[in-house]
A protein has these predicted regions:
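Active-site and adjacent substrate-binding regions of carbohydrate-active enzymes
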Residues: 2-488
């Protein structure tokens, strides 16, 4: 073993022990050796994170099938759209989950090592990665009930038998912070009897058990496979919920941060142009903690920004936004904020905690409801529920304001929102549906019963081409205006 390999092994072992303090050292050592073997030939980190982005960086957020034409794969259509319309302004593309999935529009994954053939292939992703940095979701927290792993869990077969979290009646869940309303623990009949599995986000999405170090080793292998396929930005989805301990909030626990530190360490070794992004839809100070000491996320989402900009523009009151922006610490060298105004999810309300008081928050929710928003709720420890997110497109959210009750200036308000965002420190990210000023897709909600579908409309390429070729269409005007702003 060379001196470099010895150093890597020590680093892996130390970080694994920090997570699994009660696991036999022989097991930890064996995992470190297997991971080290996978890293064989990796070069010493050298490029430096600060060189991976600059003031011109901009991220597009899109589903793999946001655009279809019935001829090419949706992924190929997306790549063609970016090359044709966004070549000079977008350098990175976040392609939302493209794996075989049973729900949540891709976030209930059956197989992390496959691309859903209805969307395209790994080759499509590799082709796109030749000219753009690709962000992919590492959905660490949970997997589909229909996955091979979960069938193994039910049947008592390895490795899946040890991959999912089930708890007994002695596990105290009274302090758990929830993002949803359904029952947290769901009964499942297995070969060894009935078990209660942990389901943070839906009954179809069963949480993994990261107290099993072999599961973490599995995900390390998956992450390295992603990098091999050209993925350079790893989005750790819902990572704050990863580790569970009885009697705690089961959110932002020490082991969760330690796992992120291990992933960062391995990614830096394997490919030093890899960027780690944590998706933690939390109050501001909790979100900031995911920078760690420069050893966790390269980027964190600026989750407080969307609701604060909405409040400013809807009520002609920038005081809260101004105070918040002045209080935000500058990102340290090698890290950055990821600024966004909309995404495939709704507008989170938890990031407004400590920024908007209850009266201000309710005022915002009332206006959003008047503008057509739906709301998703979460269960609280005291048995009540509260709004977790507002489900709406950004364009519809800004439809009518105090100063413009008829909505005549909606497009101007929409562009102003992005002008504000582009002027802030951080990397801007634009959701595909916002890029073309999409309005609330209520038909999608009606057909699916899913409130989030209001902002997840998909588009035919021919329809989109017609709109964007018409210089007088709203879609064309907004797109060209946003592109112009990005070049300033």
């Amino acid at each position: 073993m060379t001196a470099v390999e010895t150093n890597y092994r020590e680093g892996l072992t130390q970080r694994l022990v920090n997570i699994y303090r009660d696991v036999d050292t022989a097991i930890i050592g064996a995992i470190a050796d297997r991971v080290l073997a996978r890293l064989d030939g990796a070069s010493t980190p050298g490029i430096g994170a600060a060189s991976l982005w600059d003031e011109s960086s901009c991220l597009l957020i899109s589903y793999a099938d946001s655009i279809t034409d019935g001829r090419k794969s949706p992924l190929a259509c997306l790549g063609e759209f970016v090359e044709t319309h966004l070549d000079d302004v977008i350098d990175s593309v976040h392609i939302l989950p493209f794996f075989p999935s049973t729900g949540d529009d891709g976030f209930s994954v059956m197989d992390y090592r496959a691309v859903d053939p209805r969307l395209g292939s790994w080759g499509d992703l590799t082709n796109m990665s030749s000219s753009r940095k690709i962000m992919a979701d590492v959905i660490l927290n949970h997997g589909s009930r229909s996955s091979v792993w979960f069938r193994q869990f039910v049947d008592g077969e390895a490795p899946g038998s040890g991959y999912f979290l089930s708890v007994g009646d002695d596990f105290d869940v009274s302090h758990v912070i929830r993002p949803r309303e359904h029952a947290l623990l769901q009964p499942v009949t297995t070969v060894s009897g009935e078990k209660k599995v942990w389901c943070t986000f839906s009954e179809d999405q069963v949480d993994f058990d990261f107290s099993n170090p072999l599961l973490l080793e599995e995900f390390i292998s998956i992450i390295l496979d992603f990098i091999d396929h050209g993925v350079r930005i790893l989005r750790l989805d819902a990572v704050g919920f990863l580790w569970k301990e009885t009697g705690t909030s089961c959110l932002n626990l020490r082991q969760t941060h330690a796992i992120i530190q291990l992933i960062r360490y391995i990614a830096d070794i394997y490919d030093d142009e890899t960027v780690i992004v944590t998706e933690t839809n939390l109050p501001n100070q909790e979100n900031l903690s995911y920078f760690g000491n420069g050893n966790e996320a390269h980027w964190i989402y600026n989750f407080s920004l969307p609701p604060l900009i909405l409040y400013s523009l809807l009520f002609a009151d920038s005081s809260i936004l101004r105070r918040w922006s002045m209080s935000m610490p500058p990102a340290l060298m090698g890290t950055s904020y990821l600024n966004f105004l909309s995404s495939h999810d709704g507008f989170g309300m938890r990031p407004t905690e400590g920024l908007l008081d209850e009266t201000q928050r309710q005022r915002l929710l009332d206006r959003l409801e008047a503008n057509g928003s739906l709301f998703s709720r979460r269960a609280k420890a005291d048995g009540t529920t509260s709004v977790y997110e507002a489900n709406t497109t950004l364009f519809s959210a800004l439809e009518k304001s105090d100063g413009d009750p008829t909505g005549a200036l909606i497009s101007a308000r929409f562009v102003a929102a992005y002008a504000l965002m582009f002027g802030l420190e951080g990397i801007p990210a634009i959701y595909f549906n916002s890029l073309i000023s999409a309005q609330n897709h209520t038909d999608g909600v009606t057909r699916s019963g899913m409130k989030r579908r209001i902002n997840r409309q998909k588009f035919e390429k021919d329809w989109l081409d017609d709109k964007l070729s018409d210089p007088m269409s709203r879609e064309s005007i907004v797109l060209e205006t946003l592109k112009k702003l990005l070049t300033i």
